[in-house]
């Protein structure tokens, strides 16, 4: 993975994989293996999808930064739901 290699080349440590929905797409972060990812500020609400696990990890302090994709706002929605910043790079700047 290009992003992982770039992070490690700069001295970063990739230490975990957060929860994502099956096929990495969906309005909620849910899968049959790990279940639903809950909003850290209100457990009755969604963390959004599909990068909900990444947004929760940042919101709760488990990670300083997280990487995800933004197909159909799947990075920006979880960021907004979990009150963290989600940045969508300019298309073509970050290899897919």
Regions found by a protein language model. Give the residues of each.
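Structural signature of FAD isoalloxazine-binding scaffolds in flavoprotein oxidoreductases
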Residues: 76-81
